[in-house]
């Protein structure tokens, strides 16, 4: 029996569960259990029932769903921010992108899918346990071999000059890597940083003035979901609040 990658199960209340099917495995729900073989037989888009009769729908997880439910060793980059970073970086298939601060690998997956099988993501993480978890997360969801993981700090890495089409940073002190990023980034391409607080934003923008970078924009990404139960519609009571600021810098040719 060929075992697929991760599957997402949803119960009648919309609660989601990420499952990695394996031979002899069993999924346990508070309203019963179901063997992994049954999930494979139902397949994505199908339905299974636990031994107590609870109905569960079976799905292939989207990238957003996978990021929200995968195991995490660090605070995740939310899907709304990761997709915005890909847009700000202006990535396309075949490009080469540099990432620092791999974390749990969520942003890495967005970058890898954006550059495609002919592109390349070079991801640096200084903490071994974060890097190990990130590599497991990425390999479980994304079978395309277009990500290289590196243990270490970006500022200490040996990089080719003007070899990258984009730089994505999720670091507490991204200003420390600006010199290295400027060396590696192609002219007229973008560096995008993910920063939780505005003090970090100000520090980064101030530091960028000493390097061949120009500030393009600073933004927050909103995400407002609605509850629609005919004939009633209203915003959901639980909303995603502030997650981070995104800072986009454009690399200029050094004068």
UniProtKB/Swiss-Prot annotation:
This is tRNA (adenine(58)-N(1))-methyltransferase TrmI. Gene3D superfamilies: 3.10.330.20, Vaccinia Virus protein VP39 (3.40.50.150). The keyword Methyltransferase applies. It is an enzyme of class 2 (transferase). Disulfide bonds: none annotated. GO terms for cellular component: tRNA (m1A) methyltransferase complex. One of its GO terms (biological process) is tRNA processing. Contains a large catalytic C-terminal domain that binds S-adenosyl-L-methionine and a smaller N-terminal domain that may play a role in tRNA recognition. Domains are connected by a linker region. Belongs to the class I-like SAM-binding methyltransferase superfamily. TRM61 family. S-adenosyl-L-methionine binds at residues 104-107, 125, 130, 155, 170. Signal peptide: none annotated. Pfam families: GCD14, TrmI-like_N. Catalyzes the S-adenosyl-L-methionine-dependent formation of N(1)-methyladenine at position 58 (m1A58) in tRNA. Is required for cell growth at extreme temperatures. SUPFAM superfamilies: S-adenosyl-L-methionine-dependent methyltransferases. It comes from Thermus thermophilus (strain ATCC BAA-163 / DSM 7039 / HB27).
């Amino acid at each position: 029996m060929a075992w697929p990658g991760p599957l997402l199960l949803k119960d009648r209340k919309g609660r989601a569960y990420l499952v990695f099917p394996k031979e002899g495995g069993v999924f346990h729900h508070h309203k019963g259990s179901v063997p992994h073989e049954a999930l494979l037989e139902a397949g994505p888009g199908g339905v299974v029932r636990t031994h107590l009769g609870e109905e569960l729908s079976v799905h292939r997880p989207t990238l957003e769903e996978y990021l929200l439910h995968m195991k995490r060793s660090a605070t995740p980059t939310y899907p709304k921010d990761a997709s915005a970073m890909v847009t700000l970086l202006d990535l396309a298939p075949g490009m080469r992108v540099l990432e620092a601060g791999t974390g749990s690998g969520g942003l890495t997956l967005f970058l890898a899918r954006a550059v495609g099988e002919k592109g390349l993501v070079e991801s640096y993480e200084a903490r071994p346990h974060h890097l190990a978890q990130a590599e497991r997360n990425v390999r479980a969801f994304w079978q395309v071999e277009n990500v290289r993981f590196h243990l270490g700090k970006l500022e200490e890495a040996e990089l080719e000059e003007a070899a990258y089409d984009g730089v994505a940073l999720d670091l507490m002190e991204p200003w420390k890597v600006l010199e290295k990023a400027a060396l590696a980034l192609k002219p007229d391409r973008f560096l995008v940083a993910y920063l939780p607080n505005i003090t970090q934003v100000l520090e980064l923008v101030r530091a960028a003035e000493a390097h061949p970078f120009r500030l393009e924009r600073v933004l927050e990404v909103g995400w407002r979901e609605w509850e629609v139960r005919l004939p009633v519609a209203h915003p959901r009571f639980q909303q995603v609040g502030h997650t981070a600021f995104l800072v986009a810098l454009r690399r200029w040719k050094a004068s």
